[in-house]
Amino acid sequence: MCNAYRIGRDTRSTPAVLPEGLLRDLSEDRLVRRTDRAPVYAGGSDLVTMRWGFERPGLGTVNNSREDKLDGPMWRKAFQERRCLVPATGYFEFTGPKGLKRTHLFARADGTWMWIAGIWEESSEHGPCFSMITTEPNATVLPYHDRMPVVLEPGEIDDFLAGRMRHFKPPAESLRVADAANPLLKRPRPVQEELF
């Protein structure tokens, strides 16, 4: 789930609990794929660049962590000590059989930033790495996938970063979903309406 997301475009919507101007350098639309380096907020006054995905022996790169597994040995220390926010303007999901998959882009209905709950750790090989936390889907996402990123509301950000938020639920706000070209292909197939 969620192997690619977008950043960029909207710089108006930094929640009041975060430093003013935090998103000023993210006005260019950009795709982030698993193992790419991307900006995250881990406290302080600026975004920092981290690699998307924890490396685990036998598992390779694990880019998402389930909220119901955060007390397990793979995630516990990062969840207790190193939380972060992943800014995104949308994320992608895929449905259908191999070779005929359809791509769907999920974004906030008002077009503003999503603040996705994350955790991070230091890797001797890759430097700082982050993972998104996932939860059960809300009604918008359920027809497409059985998990979704934890999208925090502005009022939840402080509690999450301070470690006071330990349980997650899908956001009540419905997200906008649209068909999209597959961003993981070198030359994405056009979306149907782009053909005419």
Language-model regions, residue ranges each:
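Short linear sequence motif anchored by a di-proline
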Residues: 1-196
